């Protein structure tokens, strides 16, 4: 393990809750971005950080096979033990949401939590692409322009929104704004 789980909180007054981004808690195995690097996160310790930070809702954006690939077998049970509500919406790595209805429903669920003053954290494998896209869309839904939302997410967690397609998705989401992407 390489230190406590880091949650990067977006600095915004759009809602009374807090929006954070992180990487997959408890992930284990070979890094995709850094050859030779092994992830050895401790699931219980990472969820302990989430609980101490007061996280109420955790949105995993990874696909089902990634839970196995990253040796995250205790993920769902650990969330349950900590009283953290899971709001999953799988998105393929380095891509954009394919199921727009499901993604729109996720954004609405997370927005409701933020407006209720809860702490919401979104994550993908590395906490950059899918997590950044989702956080930026929430900021747009909350009232920011797409360019400002992307910039805020990138200030909050450098390297977020990894592909041009992901950034374009946020801008397209802004033009379609009305609650669904």
Locate predicted features.
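Short cysteine clusters
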Residues: 124
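Ser/Thr-glycine-rich phosphate-binding loops at phosphate-binding pockets of nucleotides
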Residues: 131
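Conserved G/P- and acidic residue-centered "switch" motifs that form tight phosphate/ATP-binding loops
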Residues: 127
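Cys-dependent protein tyrosine phosphatase-like superfamily
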Residues: 1-121, 134-181
């Amino acid at each position: 393990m390489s230190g406590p789980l880091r949650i990067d909180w977006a600095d915004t007054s759009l809602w009374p809750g807090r929006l954070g981004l992180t990487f997959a808690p408890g992930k284990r195995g070979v890094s995709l971005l850094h050859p030779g690097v092994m992830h050895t996160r401790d699931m219980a310790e990472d969820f302990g950080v989430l609980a101490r930070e007061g996280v109420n809702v955790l949105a995993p954006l990874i696909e089902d096979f990634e839970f196995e690939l990253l040796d995250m077998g205790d993920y769902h049970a650990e969330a349950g033990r900590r009283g953290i509500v899971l709001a999953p919406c799988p998105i393929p790595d380095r891509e954009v949401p394919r199921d727009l209805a499901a993604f729109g429903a996720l954004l609405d669920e997370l927005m409701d939590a933020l407006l209720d003053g809860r702490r919401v954290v979104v994550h993908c494998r590395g906490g950059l692409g899918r997590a950044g896209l989702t956080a930026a869309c929430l900021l747009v839904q909350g009232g920011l322009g797409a360019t400002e939302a992307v910039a805020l997410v990138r200030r909050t967690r450098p390297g977020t929104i990894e592909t041009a397609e992901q950034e374009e998705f946020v801008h397209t989401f802004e033009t379609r704004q009305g609650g669904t992407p």
